[in-house]
Amino acid sequence: MCIRDSRYITNILGHEGPGSLHAYLNEKGWIESLGAGSQSFDKNTSLIVINIAMTNQGAEKTDQIIGAVFQYINFLREQPLSEFLYDEQASLADLEFQFVESASPMGVVYSLAPKLSETIVEDLLIAPYLMKEYQPKKIKEYLNLLTRNNVLVEINSKTAKTTDTEQWFEVPYKLQLGEITVSQVKDFIPLLPTTNPFIPEELALVPRDQVTMERRHNDAKLEIWYDADSEFGAPRSVMSAEIQIKGGIASPQDQVIADLYVGLVKESLKKEVYPAYLAGISYDLRAMDAGIQILIEGFEDKQLRLFRLVLERFLSLKIDDAKLATEKESFKKNISNLALNKPYQQALNTLQELLISTKHEPNKLLANID
């Protein structure tokens, strides 16, 4: 399977924008995440893989989820292929290669050596990013292979009904051959991705000055610091905004409320910020001891656009009860899983809880969720 042709398909299958497979399943409350990619085992065997992490509600709707997956694949198969989407993906891949971050020589050799048998030496470095030839026939050929008769569905669940036990690891499982069971979802209106507004256009480097760090603004409500650094030769920057809350995030209840709200804001932004992620700009929103931090990283050109989007959503989010219930479920799962960490990780967490007043035991956090 050619990487550039499969990438067109997997980028669309894994997209999180309006009308995407991810957006539909997420809005139904059936999934926590969805990702798509290609995997090659040898010259004759390749797969297109869709990984879906389901919610408890979604685990009871596997037939509908699989049905939605094939509805979207059928939609792609029936739609005229979009050359502008391919060109957009190609320009992003070229941008990624142009400003790829340095790696250790050993790491580069380790990753390139297995590809020598299938890639000419001149293309070794650029091959993973190369999307120069638009081949609609090849893309259609791959889409036509994505059928219910040519699929392997794996469902990992604690509540799955099993019939056998694996010989070596003693893992219970069930193997079912034949046509898979799906349920048609009638309220799914699939759409193709639209133009990405976050693709950087201005890539010139800011001249480096002799000042290590400079305060550009300072008053009772706002303080701004700036530092220019072109040492790495890439038009990337980091923007960090800290919103201080009176009294800070101190008690277990404060921590739970802050984490749940941050989770809801992130969830509400998924469709809008996904194009930024594709364009090499990422963000994080996190609760800190003094308040909330918004962190933007990546290509500098469209960072302010993303920052405004995140800040406005943080200040104006309307809480949906169903989304809050899903967020609580995810929060409980994450906190409960801390007990499964490696012993040294648990020891470090306990040490922080003993020494830092704003770090709280998992049971105290769980007690404040409801």
Question: What feature does the model see in each segment?
Answer:
Residues 1-5:
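Conserved small/polar residues in nucleotide/adenosyl-binding loops
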Residues 124-266:
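Segments forming glycine/polar-rich beta-alpha architectures that bind adenosine-containing cofactors
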Residues 9-12, 257:
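Hydrophobic alpha-helical transmembrane segments of multi-pass membrane proteins
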Residues 13-18:
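Catalytic adenosine-cofactor/nucleotide-binding cores of aminoacyl-tRNA synthetases and other
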Residues 21-139, 152-156, 233-370:
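M16 family metallopeptidases and their MPP-like homologs
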